[in-house]
């Protein structure tokens, strides 16, 4: 592939999103209007897939498959669900750094790579996005964090830049979007013709059930991050 034939790539992933809940796949409007107008617009002006199959539609196994292109259970870490904060320090529950990945192969081909969003493929010091092909990382290492405090289900703060914890205020979905926009703008203004690959992996609409208007319930959710009793279709739709 020639240098001028290498397009910039942005791979956007939602978490625990039912495909039929999007307007472009027949989802009904909410009381506040269309649930997914931006995604609907992308679908209307792009390519929409209508058939698919997932042999393990849960957090970490899905990500093992996406990043390696293999059946996830060929890798030891993908046999455990979930990989959570209790897995910190494990040298087996994660994506082996030596294994080829989509970002590592693109990086070897001259791409600048970044993951902004959820990783959930093992914890430092044995595993991290920076060890599996990404040049830069901003997001949580675990499967789900509070959207405001950015704490995991064990109460540990879980928001990183690279492999260092980062304190940032704001609703996580918005923080990820802002970081992604800033990253793309930097790539466009740095004077380099190096192509880029950006993985933008949102945690939304994964639990805990919090919209942008729910900052007041953070302390209640902290004691029960799964917060399953707080989920309803109205909150879910606003998180999309």
Task: Give residue spans per PLM region.
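Formylglycine-dependent sulfatase
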Residues: 1-240
């Amino acid at each position: 592939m020639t240098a001028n034939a290498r397009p910039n790539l942005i791979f956007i992933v939602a978490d625990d999103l039912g495909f039929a809940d999007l307007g472009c796949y027949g989802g009904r409007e909410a009381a506040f209007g269309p649930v997914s107008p931006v995604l609907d617009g992308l679908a209307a002006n792009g390519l929409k897939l209508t058939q698919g199959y997932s042999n393990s539609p849960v957090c970490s196994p899905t990500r093992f498959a996406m990043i390696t292109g293999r059946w996830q259970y060929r890798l030891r870490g993908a046999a455990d669900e979930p990989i959570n904060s209790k897995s910190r320090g494990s040298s087996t529950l994660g994506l082996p750094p030596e294994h080829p990945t989509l970002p590592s192969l693109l990086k070897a081909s001259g791409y600048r790579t970044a993951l902004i969003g959820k990783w959930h493929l093992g914890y430092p010091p044995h595993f991290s996005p920076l060890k599996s092909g990404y040049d830069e990382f901003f997001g949580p290492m675990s499967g789900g964090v509070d959207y405001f405090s950015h704490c995991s289900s064990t109460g540990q703060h879980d928001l990183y830049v690279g492999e260092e914890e980062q304190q940032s205020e704001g609703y996580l979905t918005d923080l990820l979007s802002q970081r992604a926009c800033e990253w793309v703008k930097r790539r466009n203004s740095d004077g380099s013709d190096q192509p880029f690959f950006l993985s933008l992996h949102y945690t939304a609409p994964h639990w805990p059930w919090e919209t942008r208007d729910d900052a007041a319930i953070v302390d209640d959710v902290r004691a029960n991050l799964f917060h399953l009793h707080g989920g309803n279709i109205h909150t879910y739709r606003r998180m999309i």
